[in-house]
Amino acid sequence: MRFGIADAVMRPLPSPPSMPTRFFNTYSRQLEEFRPLDPAGKCVKLYTCGPTVYNFAHIGNFRAYVFEDLLQRHLEARGFEVERVMNLTDVDDKTIRGCRQLGVRLADFTQKFKDAFFDDLGTLRVKRATHFPAATEPRFIARMIEMIAVLLEKEIAYQAEDQSLYFRLSKFPEYGKLAHLNLDELRPSGRVQSDEYEKENIGDFALWKAWDEADGDVKWDSPWGPGRPGWHIECSAMATALLGPEIDIHCGGVDNIFPHHEAEIAQSESVTGKKFVRYWMHCAHLMVEGQKMAKSAGNFYTLRDLIEKGWTGREIRYALITVNYRLPLNFTFDGLRAAQSALGS
């Protein structure tokens, strides 16, 4: 008996119990069978790193968000109930610089880009997360201060002469395991360098940044004086406040692995004493026409730029999922045209 493609499509798939869900875990660099923390094996706690709302999100960002959307849909199709958190970073150097340049309040500056982000998610048909916490919400600022206080009490954190607080990497020997780096070989670069005030060791990262004039009116009171949270503690606080000390899956782009996700592990596990995340999943970089996306190269696109050029959300979404999430994606206009043809639009 011969079978055609239509017959193969119509044949029932094996029942879920015979097909265990497996994910590639960045931490172990291996495919692992997925077993949720929930004793009933039903509920999944998923944390995904969201945007820094200082500008419109670009297509590189949305590659990760569409991947995370597919992950959630896959889990739900497998019968899991997903509680997903996607954070909004609404206070950092970029957001402060942006609001000060325009002479507006930080909250007013970031709200424009929060609203735009939610509109863009709708354009790409990305499911809404269960929670979209913003770093500046009072309950999360309180959680950050609480966590830092615990780290100070354990002497894992310290206050420098400039009144900023730092995490002592020497107190967390597991640091670097996610990125598979040797702690002794780490050298500061990029966002790590921006955390340098007056530290005991060059690798120590900021937990709380003491206020200075460049921050304008962006500051919160704390037991250590006015200031603002470091980037890393924001996610640790929001994740543990909403999902508890242990999370099933944590996602993000590969650029988040170091130092951000390494720092999250160090902070969270030092406070709670529990394994922070069981499965780490990271989306690879997106290039445009074979080159790194950059405004200086003229190949930097927000989702809105592409919509203005006449492409639809469906076509862009299709183009973003044509390559395995762990492989770099070369985003091209030929690829968009292929997506358009495949969708019959």
Spans of model-derived segments:
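Alpha-helical recognition segments enriched in aromatics with Gly/Pro capping
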Residues: 4, 10-54, 69, 142-344
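N-terminal, positively charged nucleic-acid-binding surface of large information/translation enzymes
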Residues: 28-31, 37-127, 147
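Aromatic- and histidine-enriched alpha-helix N-cap/loop-to-helix transition segments
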Residues: 63, 86, 139, 230-234
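Short catalytic-loop micro-motif centered on adjacent basic/acidic residues
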Residues: 84-85, 130-134, 250-252, 337
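Short, solvent-exposed turn/loop segments enriched in Gly/Ser/Thr/Pro and often Arg
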Residues: 85-92, 134-138, 255
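The substrate-binding groove and active-site-proximal loops of carbohydrate-active enzymes
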Residues: 100-106, 132-137, 253
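Short secondary-structure capping/junction motifs at helix and strand boundaries
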Residues: 122-134, 154-164
